[in-house]
């Protein structure tokens, strides 16, 4: 924002006046009187009482004023930048600003002096009309003008910042008065985490002015070195977006990574619903960095999962500065903290040397796999000359990948191709072979990918963002569509949930396999499974080998004109097919169904019905009865976990919302009555279930005639502090909590505070490893790991992306697809004609 003190009030054009709004600065005298004051404050309505715990470690505690106020001698390129800096400071602290006076040089007529002050500076009650704008431009519709004039209460506050212009043109802070003689306005102050980001940036204003989106003729400091390359205004837009999302839901998480020079390097965020859903779908996660690798203007990295409806869900987004080991390490560590420390069973990434080294360090117990589409793309890139010279190279290469039933078959075909095309000494191919267990289907016998790895990126989850992203997409453009996309995905998930519980699936065949899972699978997955059931009709099995425990069948697939080897272990009830459909998609293929039917089975072995694809993928009920939890900390987090489940169910319909609303209102009243009844804290601690029982009885009486009175005794899972709490000893009483003192935090490395409910002190529950700033962290359903105490009772869920999957099977060409509708007349032959091949 440029503030031109040189313009007189009569010289401002209408366009300038409208564009600047409250930021107009008008001066029409050489030495302004105290009365000529303009209130240029911007109201910040965050209502953000969110606190975030400062983790333990080699850190210093942050106080409100630390490194945030202006410093004498701080330099600025112009008086406009100096004023913008003071404005941001005032926003962070919670007061309004005004330009107190300014002074010109008598010789050059250039401004050489300016004083910016609190809007309550002075002793007289002054009036201005629409911020000193000419009468002709005052709007009668403006509420400020409806009363004729606007009052500006004065308290003789001395808070101000005085800047002077040096001969070299730089503006420096000559004096600064910090103290106010009135209360500040917390409702207008930005959130604590934003305040601390500003504090870190204030050390060097060259970096600070970029973060708060001040205009500058010089090149942005973010474009120098390994820092986040975003335009000046984009970062403030992003920061405002993150603050707004967290104000809507305290479980929204974000983190800002700062370099040693206090420049922003990376930014990460994940919404509340994603963190909640991750507990149910933490088996497979992918990380796509295509937009970073392809040098998009917005270097977006995306963590993606898939829910029970085969809808893709974003589990985290980040803007990263580069593809270095340090950046990826920070990103993965931050994401791991955000989702409660529970690593995924499988993490799929692109083929990258840095990824290969970082993933095992951050996720030692996670199976690291590679996108097959990316492997194939890299083959074409690195062996482009070979591909051009030999038309049969890719067909031979794909045959090795897709049609090698055993490890030795893959190795034999691989080395045969290397010899045939003169690639025995090619280092890239040697390296690719060493990583074969991360991407080759032959080696995926012990992994479940849930449809997350496909042969073409167009079929992959992350291709969804291609509809919204292009090379020149800015942060501002992305933020504009982000909310809409999240809301749409959330509504689609709710629609799928409603269909799942209220609509009966249509049967397509008399197969016992189809019938056995019709009430188990979600509709989306059931339709995919139906394709395999109908496809089994075109398969013919022939037993080739048998021993004491296993039988091997050759299944002829007439639709694909290809044979598939299927192994059946009757003792262990295990079946496997070389097409690897179960490993890649999570449900049995037609070839295995054909063999099971041949072996006289009428139902699918239970281990092949993955819970993640069932209607009960998300646990719908708690079990057990309330137990005595000795600390407020444990009680708070247990209630938060249950509240998340309540939100998930109650948000599906207006009727369920009404039930939950009445129950919560009743519970709050009952709890307040218990807490104010005069009983001492020890009494409450020793009788934690009494209030819960009365609440339950009250809720049942409220809902009589509307809902069933049948009680589901809820058994609480036993809490083991040694297992459920992060590896920092949790206090055993409120008295012990009061004795805790945060360790020191350096500007170079800090987290946002994690603050408990009112009356409790800050708990430091996590320690950082690198320079960063963390947004609020919350206990999540199913994770049972204590990240923090939620600072807000707000149970609104931030919308979540649930991107519909394409459903293109791994070994099937993209130009074929099934369209299963509830049409009993659909012919099996039609399905066969449309079906894609397994390999």
Curated annotation (Swiss-Prot):
Subcellular location(s) of the protein: Nucleus
Region span, Disordered: 128-151, 693-725
InterPro entries: FAR1_DNA_bnd_dom, FHY3/FAR1, GH10_AS, MULE_transposase_dom, Znf_PMZ, Znf_SWIM
Chain ranges of the FAR1 domain: 84-186
Major site of localization recorded for this protein: nucleus
GO MF terms, alphabetically ordered: DNA-binding transcription activator activity, RNA polymerase II-specific; DNA-binding transcription factor activity; zinc ion binding
Mutagenesis or variant effect for residue 118 to A: Loss of DNA binding. Loss of DNA binding
Loss of function: phenotype: Reduced protochlorophyllide levels in darkness and less photobleaching in the light.
Domain MULE intervals: 284-380
GO cellular component, one term: nucleus
Keywords annotated in UniProt: Metal-binding, Nucleus, Phytochrome signaling pathway, Transcription, Transcription regulation, Zinc, Zinc-finger
Family named by the database record: Belongs to the FHY3/FAR1 family.
Subunit field text: Homodimer and heterodimer with FAR1. Interacts (via N-terminus) with PIF1 and with underphosphorylated PHYA.
Official protein name in the record: Protein FAR-RED ELONGATED HYPOCOTYL 3
Organism, scientific name: Arabidopsis thaliana (Mouse-ear cress)
Source species taxonomy: Eukaryota, Viridiplantae, Streptophyta, Embryophyta, Tracheophyta
């Amino acid at each position: 924002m440029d503030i031109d003190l040189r313009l007189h009030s009569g010289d401002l054009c209408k366009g300038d006046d409208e564009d600047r709004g409250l930021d107009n600065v008008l001066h029409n005298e050489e030495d302004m009187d105290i009365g000529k004051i303009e209130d240029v404050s911007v109201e910040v309505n965050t209502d953000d009482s969110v606190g975030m715990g400062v983790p333990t470690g080699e850190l210093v505690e942050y106080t409100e004023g630390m490194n945030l106020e202006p410093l004498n001698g701080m330099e600025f390129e112009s008086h406009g930048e100096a004023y913008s800096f003071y404005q941001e400071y005032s926003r962070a602290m919670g007061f309004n600003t005004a330009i107190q006076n300014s002074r010109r040089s008598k010789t050059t007529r250039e401004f050489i002096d300016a004083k910016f002050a609190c809007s309550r500076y002075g002793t007289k009650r002054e009036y201005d009309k629409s911020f000193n704008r000419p009468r002709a431009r005052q709007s009668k519709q403006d509420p400020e003008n409806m009363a004729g004039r606007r009052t500006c209460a004065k308290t003789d506050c001395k808070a101000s910042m005085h800047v002077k212009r040096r001969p070299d043109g730089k503006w420096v802070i000559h004096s600064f008065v910090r103290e106010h003689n009135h209360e500040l306005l917390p409702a207008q102050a930005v959130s604590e985490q934003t305040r601390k980001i500003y504090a870190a940036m204030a050390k060097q204003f060259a970096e600070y002015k970029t973060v708060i989106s001040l205009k500058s003729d010089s090149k942005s400091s973010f474009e120098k070195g390994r820092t986040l390359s975003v335009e000046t205004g984009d970062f403030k837009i992003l920061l405002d977006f993150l603050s707004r999302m967290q104000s809507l839901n305290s479980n929204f998480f974000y983190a800002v990574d700062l370099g040693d020079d206090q420049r922003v390097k990376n930014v990460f965020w994940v919404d509340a619903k994603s963190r909640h859903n991750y507990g149910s779908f933490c088996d497979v996660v992918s990380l796509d960095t295509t937009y970073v690798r392809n040098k998009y203007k917005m270097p977006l990295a995306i963590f993606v999962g898939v829910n029970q409806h085969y809808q893709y869900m974003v589990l985290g987004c980040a803007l990263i500065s580069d593809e270095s080991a340090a950046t990826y390490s920070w990103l993965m560590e931050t994401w791991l903290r955000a989702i409660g420390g529970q690593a995924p069973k499988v993490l799929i990434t692109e083929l990258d040397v840095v990824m290969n080294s970082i993933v095992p360090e951050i996720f030692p117990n996670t199976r690291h796999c590679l996108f097959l589409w990316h492997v194939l793309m890299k083959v074409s890139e690195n062996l482009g000359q070979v591909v051009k010279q030999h038309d049969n190279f890719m067909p031979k290469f794909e045959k090795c990948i897709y049609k090698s039933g055993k490890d030795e078959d893959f190795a034999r075909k691989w080395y045969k191709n290397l010899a045939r095309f003169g690639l025995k000494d090619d280092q890239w191919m040697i390296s690719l072979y060493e990583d074969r267990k991360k991407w080759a289907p032959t080696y995926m016998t012990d992994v479940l990918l849930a449809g997350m790895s496909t042969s073409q990126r167009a079929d992959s989850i992350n291709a969804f963002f291609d509809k919204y992203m292009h090379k020149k997409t800015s942060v501002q453009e992305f933020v504009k569509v982000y909310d809409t996309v999240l809301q749409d995905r959330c509504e689609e998930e709710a629609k799928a949930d409603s269909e799942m519980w209220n609509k009966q699936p249509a049967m397509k065949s008399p197969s016992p396999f189809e019938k056995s899972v019709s009430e188990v699978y979600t509709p989306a997955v059931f339709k995919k499974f139906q394709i395999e059931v109908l496809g089994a009709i075109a398969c013919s099995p022939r037993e080739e080998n048998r021993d004491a425990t296993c039988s091997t069948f050759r299944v002829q697939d007439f639709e694909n004109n290809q044979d598939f080897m299927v192994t059946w272990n009757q003792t262990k009830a295990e079946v496997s097919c070389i097409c690897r459909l179960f490993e890649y998609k999570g449900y049995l293929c037609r070839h295995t169904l054909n063999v099971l039917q041949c072996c006289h089975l009428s139902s699918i072995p239970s281990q092949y019905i993955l819970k993640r694809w069932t209607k009960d993928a998300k646990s719908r009920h708690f079990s057990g009865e309330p137990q005595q939890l000795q600390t407020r900390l444990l009680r708070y987090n247990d209630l938060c976990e249950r509240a998340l489940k309540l939100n998930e169910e109650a948000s599906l319909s207006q009727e369920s919302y009404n039930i939950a609303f009445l129950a919560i209102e009743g519970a709050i009243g009952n709890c307040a009555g218990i807490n104010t009844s005069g009983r001492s804290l020890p009494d409450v601690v020793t009788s934690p279930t009494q209030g819960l029982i009365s609440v339950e009885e009250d809720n049942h009486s409220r809902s009589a005639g509307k809902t069933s009175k049948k009680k589901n005794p809820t058994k609480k899972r036993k809490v083991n502090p040694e297992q459920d709490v992060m590896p920092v000893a949790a206090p055993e009483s409120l008295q012990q909590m009061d004795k805790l003192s945060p360790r020191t935090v350096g500007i170079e490395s800090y987290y946002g505070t994690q603050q408990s409910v009112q009356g409790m002190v800050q708990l430091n529950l996590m320690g950082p490893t690198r320079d960063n700033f963390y947004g609020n962290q919350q206990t999540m359903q199913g994770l049972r790991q204590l990240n923090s105490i939620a600072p807000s009772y707000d149970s609104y869920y931030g919308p979540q992306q649930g991107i519909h999957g394409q459903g293109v099977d791994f070994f099937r060409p993209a130009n074929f697809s099934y369209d299963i509708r509830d049409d009993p007349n659909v012919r099996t032959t039609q399905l066969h004609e449309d079906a894609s091949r397994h390999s």
